[in-house]
């Protein structure tokens, strides 16, 4: 059997972080078993569905590296097929037309409320003769659900979950305007697409009982199910806007790498021993549905930052440059020159061990391209005492005559200078850092000087000596 999974988002907004995890789990399970991962856009709510939201979902999946098989399928475009199945159930006697008016149904609910009964359709048209239908009323089509026994969901995550059929009413399959309901459309689409495993949030678990009844009415074999607990915020409450970023696009804008997000989302609800760093290839080999936890997982932004720092350190320097250049250019308000690209690439080994996001990386390297004289932050300016400026003057002379302009040679020269003058290395290096970067925090300062080059280094030292 070929494993077929699907991701079926509604295009009413961005790709939610919870949806991204659902897509990842489906993708991993399919790829790990040599199967197919399909994408279906559940766009039957025409009032809320937008092309911009579809584009955002596709873009988010593409950025995460979750490629799908074939073209995305529009649920709305399959409405005729959904109606065909509803009418087939009518012919089989597994469904019926209901002519109850909205006023009748509201009165029914009010009476149930008054008696303290569960509010559900009472089956008033289930066995009535269609000849009794009132004139001029467009009926809905309802499933003739079993009234005895139970419906059982056998779930890879939740275990065996049962409901008494007497607790379920006859759901609407086709509305009076001929449009299908969500529950019908999902079943028909999953069946026609050959979906073998449905992996989705556990907020869909109650829908599954009704969907299984549709499968049974049509004589179709249902897929296997895995209902995954939702993601909660750090405080344990259901994830909401107050917890921060909700969309995948926001995490990208905050400077997280796609491989970080894949690893992090994988560990939200699934584990492989104590492993925290799990490559995508390892995830494909190890991931299985039965090891998904049954408790909600919590976002942990500190863990996400640390994980991102790991993947930044592991990344190729040229790739990091390509990712960070647009951010740098936006901050500078101009494009980088070819020589500035080269400078950034040369500086990358010193920068990447010190940051946890691409945003930090972009902000941290701006001093490489700053116009002279550099703007100094308060701590850096405080270091430039008259004594420090005198030291910088001596370093200027020392560096001017240095034959080998490398980080190692610069460091040795400054160490020798500190020893001669009886100063600690930090007493010399920190004012130099302030002069070259405008800050008290930077990559190793001798690497910075090497990347800046002799001319730029000497000019920045000169500016710092003259600073008012």
Curated annotation (Swiss-Prot):
Stretch forming the signal peptide: none
Motif interval(s): 'HIGH' region: 9-19
Biological process according to GO: glutamyl-tRNA aminoacylation
Keyword ATP-binding in annotation: yes
Catalyses which reaction(s): tRNA(Glu) + L-glutamate + ATP = L-glutamyl-tRNA(Glu) + AMP + diphosphate
Subcellular location(s) per record: Cytoplasm
Catalytic class of the enzyme: ligase
Cross-referenced HAMAP family: Glu_tRNA_synth_type1
Function in brief: Catalyzes the attachment of glutamate to tRNA(Glu) in a two-step reaction: glutamate is first activated by ATP to form Glu-AMP and then transferred to the acceptor end of tRNA(Glu).
Family membership noted in the UniProt record: Belongs to the class-I aminoacyl-tRNA synthetase family. Glutamate--tRNA ligase type 1 subfamily.
Protein name per the record: Glutamate--tRNA ligase 2
Native species: Rhodospirillum centenum (strain ATCC 51521 / SW)
